[in-house]
Amino acid sequence: MNFAALILAGGSSRRMGQDKALLRLNGEPLLIRTSRIAAAVCDSVWICSPEPDRYQSLLSQPVQWLTEPQPTGPQGPLTALAWALPQIDADWILLLACDLPRLAIAPLQAWRQQVELLPEDCRAAIARTEQGWEPLIGFYRPAIAPTIAPWLSQGRRDFQGWLATVAVQELPLSDRDWLVNCNTPTDWQALQLS
């Protein structure tokens, strides 16, 4: 079974005030860290960004680049997923945000092993917390792509609502800490102090 990782590095980072993909944790930009971890779990790594030139010189490990079209209206991670899925040849795609500083190899490998056993009609496998699904660290079959377009055509961009319309397997979550992302300078500072 072939697994590809798709890392989204195209957000505007408005609340952070700087590019989250370039934030350094222990001297390593988050995008490099995320791609290194993804490469340990998946057979290939893809990075989706409207500005790949911004990041290409940072990465030494082999990755594939998807140059997302420049936004002409409201975008978001669901729009990026819909655009990228048909371009990647894999049985499953591990979708990752680029700003997951506590992402870890072992839990992702355990999830991959579970996902390999899922029935064909399961279209996504994602962890869930009391706030809802954690879609930016989840597994998706490429065949799910056609279900996204009707959702987007209604002006909807929310993962939670869309995921309610497809067959999703909940993945066990033993430690929520590695799902933490950073959206503001305060979040980033708190993470560095912990």
UniProtKB/Swiss-Prot annotation:
Signal peptide, first to last residue: none
GO CC annotation, single: cytoplasm
Family classification: Belongs to the MobA family.
Lineage of producing organism: Bacteria, Bacillati, Cyanobacteriota, Cyanophyceae, Synechococcales
Molecular-function annotations in GO: GTP binding; metal ion binding; molybdenum cofactor guanylyltransferase activity
Cofactor: Mg(2+)
Catalyzed reactions per annotation: Mo-molybdopterin + GTP + H(+) = Mo-molybdopterin guanine dinucleotide + diphosphate
Origin species: Synechococcus elongatus (strain ATCC 33912 / PCC 7942 / FACHB-805)
Residues reported in the UniProt entry to bind GTP: 8-10, 20, 99
Protein name, per record: Probable molybdenum cofactor guanylyltransferase
InterPro entries referenced in this protein's UniProt entry, alphabetically: MobA-like_NTP_Trfase, Molybde_CF_guanTrfase, Nucleotide-diphossugar_trans
